[in-house]
Amino acid sequence: MDQDALISKEDSEVEREASGGRESLSDVIGFLDAVLSSEPTDIGGDRSWLHNTINTLQRPGSTHRAKGEGEGEVSTSSTQDNRSGEESRVSGGTSEPEAEAHARNVDKQNIHWATGRGASTDSVPQDLGNGRDSGILEDPPNEGGYPRSGAEDENREMAANPDKRGEDQAEGLPEEIRRSAPLPDEGEGRADNNGRGVESGSPHSARVTGVLVIPSPELEEAVLQRNKRRPANSGSRSLTPVVVPSTRSPPPDHDNSTRSPPRKPPTTQDEHTNPRNTPAVRIKDRRPPTGTRSAPDRPTDGYPTHPGPETDATKKGHRREHIIYERDGYIVNESWCNPVCSRIRVISRRELCVCKACPKICKLCRDDI
C-alpha cells in the first residue's frame, strides 16, 4: 500500500514538472509572436503597449492550476494567454495611432532606399511580419528626396502600359534597347581607365562607324605614293639572280699552278744529229703563219713560251694562241682561245673551248665539236 502511494506521488511530480515546462514554453512562444507581429517604431517612439503585452504575459493567474484532493495538477490551455496578449497589443496599438503612422513612414523610406540600392525588397516586409502583401509598393512617396533614375520611371511606364510592350515585340525590337544605359563618352572612358585609353567596343560608336569609308581613286593613289616614298630596307635581299661565270675544269694532265703547257723532256743535239736513235717522224715547221709574230725558239728547260696572237679577220679583238713542241717522240700542237670576254686558258686539241664563241669564229675550233 505504501509502495503504491509512493509511485503515485512520483508520477504526480513528473506530471507537474512536464506541465510547468509546457506552460513556460507557451509563454515564450506567445511573447515572440507578439514581438514579431508588431510593427517597428523609431527609437523615440512610445512602447507602452509592448510593456502591457509583457505584463499581461507575466501576470500572475494567467496560467492557474487546479489541484484536487486525490488528483494531479491540471493546466489550462495556452491559447487563452495568446489571445489575451493579442487583445492587449491591439488595445495598445489603437491607443497610439501617431506612433504607428510614423513607423509606417519610416518603413516606406527604408523600402525605397533598398530598392534604389539594388537590395531585395521581399526580405523587408517578411521580417516586419505585418501580414500584408510582401511585394514592391506601387509608388512609394519620395519623402527622402532621393532622385529617381530614368530606367525606374520607364519600367513603371511599361508596367502601367502593357500595350506599349506588345507594340515593341510586334516590331521586333528587344526590350533591352529601352533599358540600355547610354554609351559612355570617350573622354570619360579614358579618364576612368587611368589614362590607358581603351575605347568602348560598342558597335553603335560614332568613332568606329566614321572610319568605315568607301575608298576613292584619289585615296588609293595617295596611299601608293606614300608607299613609294618609304625607304627600302637595307637588309632585304635583291631578287635579281647573280650570274656566276662557270669555269670548266682543266684536263687531268694539266697543272693549275702554272699557265704553261706540259713540261717537255730536255733533248740533246745528239738526238737530232743521229738518225739511228731518233724515230722516223717529220718535224713540223715551227714558223708561224703569215701575219703573225714569230715564236721564239724552245728553251732548253722544256717549258714552251707563248707566241704572239693570231688575229682573226672575221672578228676584231678575238685571237687564238698556240704552241707546237715535241713530247715523248710525238709532235704536240696545243692552242688556246684568248677572247676579250674570258681569261687565257690552255686547252688541248680535242676539248671544247671555254668560250662559246670560238666554234663560230675561230677556224681551228670548228673541228672540236
Curated annotation (Swiss-Prot):
CC terms in the record's Gene Ontology section: host cell cytoplasm
Gene3D superfamilies: 4.10.80.340
Residues annotated for Zn(2+) 2 binding in this entry: C341, C353, C355, C358
GO biological process, any: symbiont-mediated suppression of host cytoplasmic pattern recognition receptor signaling pathway via inhibition of MDA-5 activity
Protein location: Host cytoplasm
Biased composition annotated in UniProt, kind: Polar residues: 50-61
Modified residues (Phosphoserine): S249, S257, S260
UniProt-recorded Gene Ontology molecular function terms: metal ion binding
Claim: rRNA processing is one of the keywords in the record: no
Basic and acidic residues bias spans: 7-20, 99-110, 150-168
Predominant localisation class: host cell
InterPro entries: Paramyx_V_Zn-bd (IPR024279)
Keywords linked to the UniProt accession: Host cytoplasm, Host-virus interaction, Inhibition of host innate immune response by virus, Inhibition of host IRF3 by virus, Inhibition of host MDA5 by virus, Inhibition of host RLR pathway by virus, Interferon antiviral system evasion, Metal-binding, Phosphoprotein, Viral immunoevasion, Zinc
Domain of life (superkingdom): Viruses
Disordered: region residues: 1-24, 38-320
Residues annotated to bind Zn(2+) 1: H318, C337, C362, C365
Quaternary structure annotation from Swiss-Prot or TrEMBL: Interacts with host IFIH1/MDA5 and DHX58/LGP2. Interacts with host IRF3. Interacts with host RIGI regulatory protein (via CARDs domain) and host TRIM25 (via SPRY domain); these interactions prevent TRIM25-mediated ubiquitination of RIG-I and disrupts downstream RIG-I signaling.
Similarity remark: Belongs to the paramyxoviruses V protein family.
Stated role: Plays an essential role in the inhibition of host immune response. Prevents the establishment of cellular antiviral state by blocking interferon-alpha/beta (IFN-alpha/beta) production and signaling pathway. Interacts with host IFIH1/MDA5 and DHX58/LGP2 to inhibit the transduction pathway involved in the activation of IFN-beta promoter, thus protecting the virus against cell antiviral state. Also interacts with and inhibits host IRF3. Blocks the type I interferon signaling pathway by disrupting the RIG-I signaling pathway.
Note: The P/V/C gene has two overlapping open reading frames. One encodes the P/V/W proteins and the other the C/Y proteins.
Comment on protein domains: The C-terminal zinc-binding domain is involved in binding to IFIH1/MDA5. This domain is also involved in viral pathogenesis.
Protein name, UniProt field: Protein V
